[in-house]
């Protein structure tokens, strides 16, 4: 759930940095003195670099083989642990721990989101509508293009329903969060504000845990694509290479991916805004 890793965690992380920094704003990080902005940017860069390595190693398991549900559960446990771990990190002397929680939290969120989203193709193929389309394709009454179009539309429909429900749920969660903030009197002091942010991260992680359990217990273990003789790891690399060759023929998709990457980096909007004002 992005409220914890993407919204509140960056705020808590940067709060601790500003409170721990001396008057000149220079702190020791990775073996040399750095400004707060430099520390934040380096943390984001480290997180992004690790994500690249992680996805190159295990990313193909999201689409191929039978490991996706197990990997998703393991990654979710890590994400929940990070969220609850913030309860112990709300004072400036623990800013280094905050850096670690922030970096690992971003990685855990992005990987869980990826492996969760990868379930939609399997869900789409197992709907009644797509089973009927598959039978029609085998019988020769529809073309491959018609089947692929129906498959794409079903994936989009399921994803839109899921994200719609998530967005509606977040409205109620945000309302509860406002109540928690007033209950903890976060405006009374710096310490209250720090503690309030840690509580909010843990609360959202608890909601994430609560709504995830039915998925993990009720999800049917549908196999992913067959990697064939290549194996899962090689199939993932081959798919990446094939996509890189084809992307130049889909210039709109390339522009979309570049724009999405830039916007995602910009989601750490607190970082960008702070830099503009400093």
What is the predicted role of each segment?
Residues 8, 12, 57, 111-119, ...:
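Transmembrane alpha-helix boundary/hinge residues in polytopic small-molecule transporters
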Residues 84-87, 93, 97, 111-269:
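Intracellular loop-helix junctions on the cytosolic face of multi-pass helical membrane proteins
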Residues 51-67:
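Helix-to-loop junctions at the C-terminal end of transmembrane segments
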Residues 43-46, 50, 78, 104, ...:
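Small/hydrophobic positions within alpha-helical transmembrane segments
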Residues 1-51, 252-278:
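Helix-loop boundary and gating motifs at the non-cytosolic
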Residues 45-56, 171, 209:
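Residue-level signature of mid-helix packing/kink "hotspots" within the transmembrane helices
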Residues 45-48, 52, 72-99:
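C-terminal ends and interior cores of transmembrane alpha-helices
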Residues 14, 18, 62, 117, ...:
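Helix-terminus/helix-capping segments at the ends of transmembrane helices and short amphipathic helices
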């Amino acid at each position: 759930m992005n409220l914890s890793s993407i919204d509140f965690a960056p705020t808590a992380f940067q709060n601790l940095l500003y409170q721990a920094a001396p008057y000149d704003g220079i702190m020791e990080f990775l073996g040399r003195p750095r400004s707060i902005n430099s520390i934040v940017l380096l943390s984001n860069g480290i997180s992004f670099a690790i994500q690249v390595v992680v996805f190159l190693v295990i990313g193909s398991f999201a689409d191929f083989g039978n490991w996706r549900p197990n990997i998703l559960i393991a990654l979710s446990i890590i994400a929940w642990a990070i969220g609850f771990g913030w309860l112990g990190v709300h004072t400036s002397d623990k800013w280094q721990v905050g850096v670690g929680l922030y970096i690992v939290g971003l990685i855990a969120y992005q990987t869980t989101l990826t492996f969760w989203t990868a379930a939609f193709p399997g869900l789409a193929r197992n709907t009644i509508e797509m089973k009927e389309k598959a039978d029609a394709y085998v019988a020769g009454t529809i073309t491959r293009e018609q089947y692929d179009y129906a498959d794409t539309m079903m994936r989009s429909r399921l994803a839109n329903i899921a994200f719609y429900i998530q967005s509606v749920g977040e409205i109620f969660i945000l309302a509860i969060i406002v109540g928690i903030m007033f209950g903890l009197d976060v405006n009374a002091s710096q310490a209250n504000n720090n503690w309030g942010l840690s509580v909010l991260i843990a609360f959202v992680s608890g909601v994430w845990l609560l709504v995830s359990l039915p998925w993990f217990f009720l999800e049917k273990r549908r196999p992913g694509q067959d990697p064939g003789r290549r194996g899962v790891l090689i199939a993932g690399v081959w798919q990446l290479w094939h996509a890189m060759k084809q992307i130049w023929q889909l210039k709109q998709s390339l522009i979309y991916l570049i724009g999405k990457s830039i916007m995602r980096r910009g989601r750490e909007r607190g970082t960008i805004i702070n830099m503009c004002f400093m």
